[in-house]
């Protein structure tokens, strides 16, 4: 027991000691922990304060960035700001009473620094922070009064300042409520034109439990104060280059507000404002005056659009569409006037630039067109003398057809009927060229052209005659004074060339007349007879395989060989009398007006033939220009000159020849068809040598056909195979009449209606052919003389008197009887 007692107190003592030790250790640790937490808290607080300062600084910077920059203003007041005392007294401009509870605000550098209200005496004392060089504006306003602003600026720092602001009382306006619009008008008794404000009824937003009848409108016009210059000056701000102060001189001012239940209603939208203007000399109708409104945040007048000056009831008014109700003034300023003038000037300049450009362009176009027309005219004038239009040529092509042994004269087919005066001298001025299928002649010298020209004139005399048909008791006689017109059958007297050989004296006189005429008119020596064709006999070569087709045989009749009946070239066939046994083509109507004085030149006998008798024919001249193996008159095939009858003549001539030569075996070389149908070997003809002493050379040719008997056949075989017959589709009725078949040294057969050979051919049908007498009947002579007497002087213009006498005295049939036909067997 004693041992147990000893152990308990020791354990208790050890426990107490441990507890005490533990108690000492815990507060020390706690105190250590508390000391460490306080430091961290302080640090955290400091960090939070720094962050708050940074955030505030950022906010201030953002707020300053949002404000407009003003020259001389700084974002932060770096320098120490001076403060001075400012006393503001507010009163009524009409009653001069002090206004209590009026709001007074101070703006320094377009920022609000102070805002307070007046006391009962209408005064208030304000501490204003100010720095030299900054703008300062004091604004006072009160319900029922128009806002008044006072811009102020000083060059020295004041200690104390006192100012008085007079407020304009608002005038109650007349308000008119319509279903869709609201009209507010003024109450000016002495004004000719009342101010008015009109806007849509939908723009009014009434509070709850408010009716439209509780709305009250106020419209105040300050022009009565402007008359006495009692309106305070205003300062405007433009944004031309940042913020710039502009001194304003208002011409009109209006304040419009709407109240409902004592509270102002805000109206935003398109509001039409019409305000009368003062009579000033510098305002005209159509001028644009800028509109200004007061900004309550910056304390300055701000430009907001343009108004237009108009005339109403003989008074000038300023009209403007405002974005909201409030306080508006119309005041021009130098800066805004410059803007307006510049804009107007730019508009006017642009308008006039377009207008002047259009005028200048039109003028340039007109000038260019004028010069172009002038250039074309001058070019045409200069080029006219150089033009050589070949309307009609002197036998352009002289072509020999070896197949038919005929001479084709290819002319330019189109001959103009109307010619210009300057082109007439060129009508007969052309070159002559001849070619054959085997060869073409090269260019000739000028001397050779003259020789060819003379030969052409001498060798190609074409006998033409105007023919009309007079039917008296079935007897047809030739009337040389009438011509058959192919168009309407109208008969017109024309000049007649009877191809009578003149005497030596008459020829010399006529030659002198024609030479003088050629010198006057500048005509060439191409005779008019080349344009008028007279049917004559022709020699045609026939090949066995050429006329095999029946339609070709029908259209290949001769145009010169006489036969009875009427010949119709086309689908139309009519019965005719057998007295119409010959065919003669009338003179071309298109050439009837081209009769020049040189048309009678072919009747003149050249030097070697002037001493020969007048009965001698001129067919011998064909032999001078034809080739060696052909000396056949080519008058028929020269009819290609006459475009309307060219193809008919060729086809008719060949068809007649084929009919006459039917049933006979083809000759190995060629056939010559005479008037009595005899072959070449049995036909002979006596001829008169017109050039007895001057002709030294002659070709060994047949007197009848003109074919060179010594010429080889090889050169002509191919040409025969190439021959074709050209036919026309238009029906042409050609009447047969006796022909002037003259003989010459070329060997052509001469026949007349009195010849027995012609009578033998024409007796194929029944009836009796009435023979023409050798001498002309007196009735015929009288008819000719009467017609020549009645011929108009216009048709006889240019005819020499000797030729007229010779034509009236000479008879063609008499000449034919003087040429005897002697058959040589």
Swiss-Prot record:
Species of origin: Mus musculus (Mouse)
Membrane topology, record value: Single-pass type I membrane protein
Composition skew (Basic and acidic residues), residue ranges: 57-68, 772-784, 804-825
Keywords of this entry: Glycoprotein, Membrane, Phosphoprotein, Signal, Transmembrane, Transmembrane helix
Family that this chain belongs to: Belongs to the FAM171 family.
Domain of life per record: Eukaryota
Pfam families membership: FAM171A1-2-B_C, FAM171A1-2-B_N
Annotated GO CC locations: membrane; synapse
Modified residues (Phosphoserine): 792
Gene that this polypeptide is encoded by: Fam171b
Tissue specificity of this protein: Expressed in the brain, predominantly in the thalamus, in the hippocampal formation (in CA1, CA2 and CA3 regions and in the dentate gyrus), in the cerebellum (in Purkinje and granule cell layers, as well as neurons of the deep cerebellar nuclei) and cerebral cortex (at protein level). Expressed predominantly in neurons.
Renumbered residue ranges of the record's region Disordered: 52-74, 693-717, 770-825
Membrane side Cytoplasmic: residue ranges: 375-825
InterPro entries: FAM171, FAM171_C, FAM171_N
Residues annotated as glycosylated: 109, 114, 214
Signal peptide: 1-32
Residue ranges, Extracellular side: 33-353
Localization in the cell: Cytoplasmic granule; Membrane
Chain segments annotated as transmembrane: 354-374
Protein name: Protein FAM171B
């Amino acid at each position: 027991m004693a041992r147990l007692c000893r152990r308990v107190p020791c354990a208790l003592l050890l426990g107490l000691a441990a507890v005490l030790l533990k108690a000492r250790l815990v507060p020390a640790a706690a105190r250590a922990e508390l000391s460490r937490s306080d430091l961290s808290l302080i640090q955290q607080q400091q960090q939070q304060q720094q962050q708050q300062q940074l955030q505030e600084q950022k906010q201030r910077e953002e707020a300053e960035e949002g404000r407009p920059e003003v020259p001389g203003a700084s974002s932060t007041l770096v320098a120490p700001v001076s403060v001075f005392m400012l006393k503001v007294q507010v009163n009524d401009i009409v009653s001069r009473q002090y206004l209590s509870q009026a709001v007074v605000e101070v703006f320094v550098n377009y920022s609000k620094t102070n805002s307070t209200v007046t006391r009962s005496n209408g005064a208030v004392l304000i501490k204003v922070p100010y720095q030299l060089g900054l703008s300062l504006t004091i604004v006072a306003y009160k319900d029922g009064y128009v806002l008044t602003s006072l811009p102020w600026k000083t060059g020295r720092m004041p200690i104390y300042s006192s100012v008085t602001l007079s407020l304009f009382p608002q005038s109650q306006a007349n308000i008119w409520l319509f279903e869709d619009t609201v009209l507010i008008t003024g109450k000016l008794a002495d004004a000719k034109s009342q101010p008015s404000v009109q806007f849509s009824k939908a723009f009014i937003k009434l509070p709850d439990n408010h009716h439209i009848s509780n709305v009250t409108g106020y419209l105040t016009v300050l022009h009565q104060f402007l008359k006495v210059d009692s309106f305070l000056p205003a300062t405007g701000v433009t944004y031309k280059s940042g913020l710039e102060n502009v001194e304003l001189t208002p011409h009109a001012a209006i304040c419009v507000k709407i109240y409902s239940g004592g509270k102002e209603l805000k109206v935003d939208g398109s509001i039409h404002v019409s305000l009368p203007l003062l009579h000033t000399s510098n305002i005209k109708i159509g001028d644009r005056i800028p509109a200004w409104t007061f900004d309550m945040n910056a304390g300055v007048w701000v430009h907001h659009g343009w108004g237009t000056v108009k005339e109403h009831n003989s008074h000038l008014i300023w009209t403007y569409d405002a974005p909201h109700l409030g306080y508006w003034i119309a005041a021009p300023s130098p800066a805004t006037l410059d803007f307006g003038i510049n804009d107007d000037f730019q508009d006017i300049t642009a308008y006039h630039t377009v207008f002047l450009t259009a005028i200048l362009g039109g003028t340039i176009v007109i000038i260019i067109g004028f010069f172009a027309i002038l250039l074309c005219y001058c070019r045409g004038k200069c080029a006219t003398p150089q033009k050589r239009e070949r309307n009609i040529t002197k036998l352009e092509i002289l072509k020999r057809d070896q197949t038919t042994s005929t001479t084709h004269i290819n002319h330019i087919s189109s001959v103009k009927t109307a010619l210009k005066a300057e082109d007439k001298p060129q009508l007969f001025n052309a070159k002559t060229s001849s070619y054959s299928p085997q060869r073409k002649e090269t260019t000739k010298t000028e001397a050779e052209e003259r020789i060819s020209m003379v030969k052409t004139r001498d060798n190609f005399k074409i006998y033409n005659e105007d023919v009309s048909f007079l039917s008296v008791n079935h007897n047809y006689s030739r009337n040389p004074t009438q011509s058959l017109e192919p168009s309407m059958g109208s008969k017109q007297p024309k000049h007649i060339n009877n191809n009578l050989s003149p005497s030596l004296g008459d020829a010399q006189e006529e030659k002198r007349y024609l030479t003088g005429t050629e010198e006057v008119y500048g005509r060439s020596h191409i005779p008019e007879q080349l344009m008028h064709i007279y049917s004559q006999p022709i020699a045609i070569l026939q090949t066995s395989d050429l006329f095999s087709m029946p339609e070709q045989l029908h259209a290949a009749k001769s145009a010169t060989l006489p036969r009875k009946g009427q010949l119709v070239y086309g689908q139309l066939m009519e019965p005719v009398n057998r007295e119409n046994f010959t065919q003669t083509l009338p003179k071309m109507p298109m050439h009837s007006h081209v009769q020049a004085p040189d048309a009678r030149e072919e009747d003149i006998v050249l030097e070697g033939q002037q001493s020969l008798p007048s009965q001698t024919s001129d067919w011998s001249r064909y032999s001078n220009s034809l080739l060696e193996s052909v000396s056949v008159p080519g008058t028929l095939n020269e009819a290609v000159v006459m475009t309307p009858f060219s193809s008919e003549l060729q086809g008719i001539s060949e068809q007649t020849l084929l009919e006459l030569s039917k049933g006979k075996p083809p000759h190995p070389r060629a056939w010559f068809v005479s008037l009595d149908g005899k072959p070449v070997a049995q036909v002979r003809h006596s001829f008169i040598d017109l050039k007895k002493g001057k002709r030294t050379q002659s070709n060994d040719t047949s007197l009848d056909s003109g074919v060179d008997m010594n010429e080889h056949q090889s050169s002509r075989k191919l040409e025969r195979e190439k021959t074709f017959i050209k036919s026309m589709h238009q029906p042409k009725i050609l009447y047969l009449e006796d022909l002037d078949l003259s003989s010459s040294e070329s060997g052509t057969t001469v026949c007349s209606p009195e010849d027995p050979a012609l009578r033998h051919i024409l007796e194929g049908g029944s009836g009796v052919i009435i023979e023409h007498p050798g001498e002309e009947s007196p009735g015929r002579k009288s008819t000719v003389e009467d017609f020549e007497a009645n011929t108009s002087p216009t048709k006889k213009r240019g005819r020499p008197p000797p030729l007229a006498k010779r034509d009236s005295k000479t008879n063609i049939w008499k000449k034919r009887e003087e040429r005897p036909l002697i058959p040589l067997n």
